[in-house]
């Protein structure tokens, strides 16, 4: 069911995403579709599992991989100057460990907007 007149805005905040993951699982159970969705940081990462209609996917990422050194670690920082292992997060996870349904994501009838900030220029 398309929920007209309501947009979703998802904040960042790392582990706060676990709450959002549960909310999106409920939205999927009720088959709710929102026409406009805005995500920032972790909120943007979490929303894609909802848009691809993959219940439990975000929860599994958080429960099974956030503590993995490939996901976040000092060794990542020393190697790439980022705590996050983006190759692991954006390639290994969605392509192999927890496959992402790109086709279902593309078919989502609503629009996704993602807020970003350049770390140098703001």
Regions found by a protein language model. Give the residues of each.
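Patatin-like phospholipase
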Residues: 1-40, 48-122
């Amino acid at each position: 069911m398309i929920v007209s007149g309501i947009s979703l805005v998802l904040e960042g905040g790392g582990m706060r995403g676990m709450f959002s993951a549960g909310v999106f699982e409920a939205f999927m159970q009720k088959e709710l579709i929102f026409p406009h969705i805005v995500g920032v940081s972790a909120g943007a990462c979490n929303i894609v599992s909802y848009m691809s209609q993959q219940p439990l996917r975000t929860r599994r990422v958080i429960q099974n991989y956030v503590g993995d050194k490939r996901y976040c670690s000092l060794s990542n920082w020393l190697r790439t100057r980022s705590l996050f292992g983006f190759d692991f997060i954006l390639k290994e996870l969605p392509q192999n460990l927890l496959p992402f349904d790109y086709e279902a994501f593309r078919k989502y009838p609503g629009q996704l907007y993602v807020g970003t900030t350049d770390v140098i220029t703001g």
